[in-house]
UniProtKB/Swiss-Prot annotation:
Catalyzes the sequential NAD-dependent oxidations of L-histidinol to L-histidinaldehyde and then to L-histidine. NCBIfam families: hisD. Its cofactor is Zn(2+). GO terms for cellular component: cytoplasm; cytosol. It comes from Synechocystis sp. (strain ATCC 27184 / PCC 6803 / Kazusa). It catalyses: L-histidinol + 2 NAD(+) + H2O = L-histidine + 2 NADH + 3 H(+). This is Histidinol dehydrogenase. GO terms for biological process: L-histidine biosynthetic process.
Amino acid sequence: MTRILKLSHLTPQQLNQLKRRSEQNIDQALAIAKEVIEQVKMEGDAGVLHYSRQFDFAGATAENLRVSEAEFAEAEKLVDPELRRAVEHAFRNIEKVHAGQMPPPMHLAEIEPGVFAGEKITPLPTVGLYVPRGKGAFPSMMLMLAVPARVAGVKKIVVCTPPDKEGKVEPVSLVTARMAGVDEVYKLGGVQALAAIAYGTKTVSKVDKLIGPCSIYGAAAKRLLSGIVDVGLPAGPSESIVLADETTDPKLAALDLLIEAEHGSDSAALLVTHSASLAEKALGYLGEYLEKLPPWRKKFCEDGLGSYGGILLTDSLQASLDFINDYAPEHLQVLTADPLKLVGKIDNAGEILLGNYTPSSAATYAIGVNAVLPTGGFARSYSAVSVFDFLKRSTLAYLTEEGFAGVKETVTTLADYEDFPAHALAIRERENLL
């Protein structure tokens, strides 16, 4: 049942539980994920197939784990033209947004006479993208991950996505993968998929980085694999905050609260407001809109709103903003009287969506901003997926003779103080050698 919680009445323990979302259950998931990872690490393909046959499809073999060219061709024939046009529209906007993020491949600046410093930007050689499916098909997620990787110039893009029980990958996702420049798609889900691309097997390519949203078990696996491969931003179960005030239409507040709530029973969706009247009205409309959803989506909403979300009533707009910055939501929708005025007061959110015409669903599919965002409070230190997740930076420096002369005394003084004689010797001897 959806709750109205009064922020000032919550005990420290209750507030902490609210801020932890479903991550409070991760300890059990860690034990399960560790067992799967160890088996894949030790047995390679055999370990992957053991779990794939249990959780993906019973007929999994080393030969059919990778999507074939024939399967890509078949998928092309199955996609409805209207759906293809929608995917192409989303692709264009996502590509434009991420192309605009690209830095120059190299820059050097003269910071004092003869002293040049800068960076060289290089794409990662290989990345593994995890595109979930458990609660539905997500071709949009394929775009959000693969397009910035391709724009960044990654040489090899590998995707793992769960198949259906017949061993088929959803056709729109395959068409989208080709559109976005994916090189390999494997019919793998869950912890076994992440372990396979982290360690590599005879069949599955090893990658330099893996990235993508996961269930709580996938989030646990990423923690365990973080010493083996770069696991990117923490992207677990969906979460959102809708910020409202007394001017907000309660129908919009109720509608937008359900957007992230329908992702799953482990999703955390909160309506945060200092208006008791708005809170009560929105709660009433929630029941009405829940009845418009399929039973299984309705249950996801009811479970998540009852366990990890609901309506949070604060004492003031400032108290709402303070809570938001502390909670650091994945998605933040601002439905207040003047949303632009509040942007400068919001420090911690994966995405900030402003105004009545910008629901989270529009950002998920069509605006072009990336919808793969940090969860679990990690928006305090992580950002949305971008081209920068697929690029690495090498510092670049060059000294002319004049520049060397200008810094040599500083270098030798500091090297002597820190007792690194070889550092200082490399400077002093150069005066005799050059």
